Amino acid sequence: MHDPRPLAEKAAALLKARGERIAIAESSAGGLISAALLGVPGASAYFTGGGIIYTPRALKTLLGVAREDLKDMRSSSEPYAAFLAETVRAKHRVEWGLSETGAAGPTGNPYGDPPGHTCFAVAGPVNLARTLRTGSADRIATMWAFAEASLALLVSALEQRS
């Protein structure tokens, strides 16, 4: 099983040291990214909020984005992940946004991506986006892998800013 705590602790330390804050928009990680960051003592100093953007209704309700606002962009893509990260960052008026969007399994998504596929992005002073394919249909293991990879990307962005 993956353990994102060391990455969450590193991200928290970097955010707190600079007095910066983050908001999260995650999908198939199911709240594990937020939970890892909130599990670090003192999270209120750097974590402002976010949501699990699992459906078009959640996208509209939590971020104020309608499907027609996305034009030709599809979920589970790096451009969509970057859009979500920037949107959640701007909505919360914070320095950093982190997003994740994928297919945890045991089946793929409606866009043809296999289980274990996700895209994730960081928006802020450093912008990064990546794709991960775990090759696994194990839903729980994949969700943890998505959270860990997303936090690793966040740490990378924070370290690039240093």
Give the ranges of each region predicted by the language model.
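Short alpha-helical segments enriched in small residues
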Residues: 1-162
